[in-house]
Amino acid sequence: MSEPIYVLGGSQTDFARNWAREDLSIYDMFCEVLNQALTSTGISPDQIEVGHVGNFVGDLFTGQGLIGGFFAEAHPELSAIPTSRHEAACASGSIAILSAMRDIEAGHYDLACVLGLEYMRNVDGQTGAEYLGAATWKGVEATDCDFPWPFMFDQIINEYDVRYGINCDHLKAISKINFDNGRRNPNAQTRQWSFPPECYTDSDQFNPVIEGKVRKMDCGQITDGAACVFLASEKAAKAYAAEHQLKLSDIPVIKGWGHRSAPLSLDSKLKLSAGQPFLFPHVNQLMTDALCRAGFSHVTELDGLETHDCFSITEYMAIDHIGLTAPGESWKAIEEGRIGMDGDFPINPSGGLLGLGHPVGATGVRM
């Protein structure tokens, strides 16, 4: 990257909160996380030059669109800055981050605010599942099921089984690691939840089937929450460091990134990867891109990973696609204890989407 992008800091809401029960709106959520971020960093509103919002389904859950307009409602100093909202399903927050990076790299702005949020616990589970199904190809896939995404990820489990073989005990192990990690996170949705050992078995009482091979403990949470970060050019980061008596080297830098896409339908994705080593080649390619841009040759040069485990099979897929194991051999990293907190490559120390929670538009910003 020609222009280094610095991360000045930010904030995250408590993902255990139910904002509807508190009689608080999506605007209240927006304001709270923004103000927390301003306070924690010491940045003043008049220093922000551009605002980016990550949000997937605010229109459906709350009826609210044009969420970027909340910046000016929250602080009059922000009434003239350019703002935009980004929707890319579960990658909405990450795309908001990348868009802010592009603004800074192009030299248009020096200090960007990126805010991701989702307000989802105001409806029943069935309605929420239908809203989240907007990211499937409507009318083409997941048409005959109660829960679209558990249904879709069950198909991924089945495809893994056909191509490589899979033992669902390894998926249960992933779930347990993430829920255990979440107990250590003061912002995790599940930190105070109790999970008896039977939850990680095929017990229909403690771990009922949702769709196919996908059971309750395999599923990410329906979560309310928001996250906010400030990204800066080197010029703005130097000024911030001087103002706050910091060394520039004390401020984190985004070293690399990857961004790839694939056809909308799962069937199209799987047809494209037929005969190839990886189930989703574009996922392997984006990790290769990110490592290359960051100056790394292999994922094991990193100390660990935060990955998108909306379902346990998603993390299972990530393990081999990032190169930690050969394709289809994610189970080896699990059995060898590599991905737990005591392993040589911890995955999702935060608890991930399973343990920490998954307010969809906030997840990429939080990560």
Task: Identify what each model region corresponds to.
Residues 58-111, 115, 119-152, 192-221, ...:
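Conserved catalytic cysteine-centered active-site region
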Residues 19-21, 64-65, 123-129, 183-187, ...:
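Short acidic, glycine/serine/threonine-rich loops at helix termini
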Residues 168-175, 184, 197-207, 241-245:
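Acidic-enriched catalytic cores of C-N bond-cleaving enzymes acting on peptides and small amides
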Residues 142-191, 306, 355:
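Conserved thiamine diphosphate
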Residues 1-91, 99, 156-168, 189-190, ...:
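Conserved active-site "lid/cap" helical segment
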